[in-house]
From Swiss-Prot:
It comes from Solanum tuberosum (Potato). It holds the Pfam family Chal_sti_synt_N. Its EC number is 2.3.1.74. Coiled coil: none annotated. Belongs to the thiolase-like superfamily. Chalcone/stilbene synthases family. This is Chalcone synthase 1A.
Length: 389
């Protein structure tokens, strides 16, 4: 008879969890950041708030964002005027949009990842889906499984309403699933649409206005598994370790609340300071076992919550400017897409590394770090090992 120990050993993979494919998607509606303040104040019937508009223009100018993608068009907003007010009951209208569009955008990203992976979708064993855009039952995971035609036996996990750090969380969970289930192939999808957070401006709540200047829509998907099939699957990055921690004395720094008016967003000014002050502790805990203490020897994927966070992290750690190039590139071209950002940055990095002939998927370097930051304040730290290109 087989012992429990033998049975458990047979269930586990031998090698580390590996990212085997990445796909991304955005809505077709592209918004130019330089003209967005005029559009935003016009569509929200707020053009009389001239001083506030000037403040918003300065926010957009400082955002380091050139363009964003948004499902919400002028037509949709004109049909739903309550979404354009600052605090008008509008959750039903918002929910009607996101329960359809979040899985749909996720499907586009997933199809690209599956195509790159090159294996039949029937080989997908697990699905991990996350979004901060709306809540529904059965969830987006169920809707996506139906849209893609995944097997009914696919083991699903749905994460709602976690915020910007969760791009790191889903990698941590997928790592555990891949390494503890021999032969598992995990489809991970992050899909975000700002229809839940869009609202008009308010003089008394400038933190809400910060969100209007930063957030964009996007979905990203990866396929993850251990022990890639040689000659069939192409590894991109290996996941070596993953950790989550709460930043001390940071309660209330970032809050979101689902209300009749949609998802409200609250931000303390000190978020960049709190993150930069505590980031080295996470790095030390992650890289001391590997004997690494030079943060410039790593390739970097950091959730781009906003330019101030990136600037302060760079300053605090003495990072060379090029370290956050891929991160800043994604912020510039897409804005803050919450959970999807770090996967967009991974995609940007591996493509640029190949195009520039840098030798590895991680800008020619062997080891890297992926950071997720969000409500809590919660920090996700993922240690990555690159693959030769």
């Amino acid at each position: 008879m087989v012992t429990v120990e033998e049975y458990r050993k047979a269930q586990r993979a031998e090698g580390p969890a590996t990212i085997l494919a990445i796909g991304t998607s955005t809505p077709s509606n592209c918004v130019d950041q330089s003209t967005y303040p005029d559009y935003y104040f016009r569509i929200t019937n707020s053009e009389h708030k001239t001083e506030l508009k000037e403040k918003f223009k300065r926010m957009c100018d400082k955002s380091m964002i050139k363009k964003r993608y948004m499902h919400l068009t002028e037509e949709i907003l004109k049909e739903n005027p309550n979404m354009c007010a600052y605090m008008a009951p509008s959750l039903d209208a918002r929910q009607d949009i996101v329960v359809v569009e979040v899985p749909k955008l996720g499907k586009e990203a997933a199809q690209k990842a599956i195509k790159e992976w090159g294996q039949p979708k029937s080989k997908i064993t697990h699905l991990v889906f996350c979004t901060t855009s709306g809540v529904d039952m059965p969830g987006c995971d169920y809707q996506l499984a139906k849209l893609l035609g995944l097997r009914p036996s696919v083991k699903r996990l749905m994460m709602y309403q976690q915020g910007c750090f969760v791009g790191g969380t889903v990698l941590r969970l997928a790592k555990d699933l891949a390494e503890n289930n021999k032969g598992a192939r995990v489809l991970v999808v992050c899909s975000e649409i700002t229809a839940v957070t869009f609202r008009g401006p308010s003089e008394s709540h400038l933190d809400s206005l910060v969100g209007q200047a930063l957030f964009g829509d996007g979905a990203a998907a990866i396929i993850m598994g251990s022990d890639p099939i040689i000659g069939v699957e192409r590894p991109l990055f290996e996941l070596v370790s993953a950790a989550q921690t709460l930043v001390p004395d940071s309660e209330g720094a970032i809050d979101g609340h689902l209300r009749e008016v949609g998802l409200t967003f609250h931000l303390l000014k000190d978020v960049p300071g709190l993150i930069s002050k505590n980031i080295e502790k996470s790095l030390l805990e992650a890289f001391q076992p590997l004997g690494i203490s030079d943060w410039n020897s790593l390739f970097w994927i950091a959730h781009p919550g906003g330019p101030a966070i990136l600037d302060q992290v760079e300053l605090k750690l003495g990072l060379k400017q090029e370290k956050l190039r891929a991160t800043r590139e994604v912020l510039s071209n897409y804005g803050n897409m919450s959970s999807a950002c770090v996967l967009f940055i991974l995609d940007e990095m591996r493509k640029a590394s190949t195009n520039e002939g840098l030798g590895t998927t991680g800008e020619g370097l062997e080891w890297g770090v992926l950071f997720g930051f969000g409500p809590g304040l919660t920090v996700e730290t993922v240690v990555l090992h690159s693959v030769a290109t």
